[in-house]
């Protein structure tokens, strides 16, 4: 079977807009081109081609592509064709790397990606906490929300406090925080909420949150304060903040091999919701 491909500026995209808008919303404001792969009238997948710092897995300016499988109900042969053709398109566009995230249950997809030159980059869980009971928050820590002009102070502490992570994607992101254009920083800052966390006058943690979505993007604790309950209190602060924002649940991601963190999250009421794998192809 041969899939049909339409580009982002093709008039036919309007006919599939409803199926793809959740994926295109974050890229279209940046002018990132994309291609839609169709089987008949069904959207099988999407490919976006742009440059860092879209994902921060490589230095700013690095050309990249991101694949999204939209319809996992398609026959395996169709999904394999999409992934193979998406990689061909990416090579034609001269990207340095391509990557895709998919549910770990789809082992046949992992096998196919391995066969066309991809390697596993990350293996992680998404965990959920249902905010249906009152949240108690200890009062040992103080949380101060950051202003935009304080980003220069935030990134160095983020690197320091999140060092030693078992998350390969996070490690790459921390390496590539330099030279991000101010316009993109403005857009990013408008979507997130950052906090410095204090014990007395000392900064002992950082938080990167999306409160309206109930999403904990990053939580970092100073190495000298790990294992002392600081991280747990920071998480409880997040849960209370999200609950006050009207969120019904809180979500976070964690490396599947980080059993210590998973245990802490489960103790606080989180449960594993989804198991995801990230595969990457490099030129």
Predicted regions located by residue number:
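A short beta-loop-alpha structural element at the N-terminal edge
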Residues: 1-15, 142-156, 162-163
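Conserved donor-binding loop and adjoining core beta-sheet/short helix segment
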Residues: 25-82, 204-214
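A conserved beta-strand-loop-helix scaffold within acyl/acetyltransferase catalytic domains
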Residues: 49-56, 171-172, 179-214, 219
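Residue-level recognition of the GNAT/N-acetyltransferase active site
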Residues: 69-74, 103, 222, 226, ...
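Acyl-donor-binding surface of acyltransferase catalytic domains
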Residues: 72-141, 279
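Conserved acetyl-CoA-binding loop-helix of GNAT-fold acetyltransferases
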Residues: 75-88, 221, 227-240, 263-267
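Conserved hydrophobic beta-strand within the GNAT/NAT acetyltransferase core sheet
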Residues: 98-101, 216, 250-254
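Conserved active-site alpha-helix within GNAT-family acetyltransferase domains
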Residues: 104-122, 232, 257-274
């Amino acid at each position: 079977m041969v899939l049909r491909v339409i580009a982002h500026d093709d008039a036919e995209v309007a006919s599939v807009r409803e199926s793809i808008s959740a994926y295109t919303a974050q890229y279209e404001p940046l002018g990132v081109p994309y291609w839609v792969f169709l089987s008949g009238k069904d959207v099988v997948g999407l490919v976006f081609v742009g440059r860092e710092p879209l994902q921060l897995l490589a230095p700013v300016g690095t050309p990249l592509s991101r694949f999204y499988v939209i319809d996992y109900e398609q026959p395996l042969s169709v999904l394999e064709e999409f992934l193979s053709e998406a990689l061909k398109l990416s090579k034609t566009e001269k990207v340095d790397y391509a990557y895709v995230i998919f549910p770990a249950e789809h082992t046949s997809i992992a096998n196919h990606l391995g066969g066309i030159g991809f390697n596993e980059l990350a293996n992680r869980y998404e965990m959920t906490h249902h905010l249906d009971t009152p949240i108690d928050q200890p009062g040992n820590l103080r949380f101060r929300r950051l202003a935009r002009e304080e980003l220069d102070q935030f990134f160095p502490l983020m690197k320091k406090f999140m060092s030693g992570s078992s998350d390969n994607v996070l490690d790459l992101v921390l390496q590539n925080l330099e030279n991000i254009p101010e316009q993109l920083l403005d857009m990013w800052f408008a979507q997130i909420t950052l906090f410095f966390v204090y014990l007395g006058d000392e900064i002992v943690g950082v938080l990167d949150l999306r409160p309206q979505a109930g999403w904990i993007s990053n939580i970092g604790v100073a190495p000298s304060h790990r294992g002392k309950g600081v991280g747990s209190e920071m998480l409880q602060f997040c849960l209370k903040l999200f609950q006050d924002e009207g969120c019904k649940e809180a979500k976070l991601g964690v490396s599947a091999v980080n059993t210590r963190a998973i245990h802490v999250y489960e103790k606080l009421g989180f449960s594993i919701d989804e198991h995801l794998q990230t595969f990457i192809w490099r030129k």
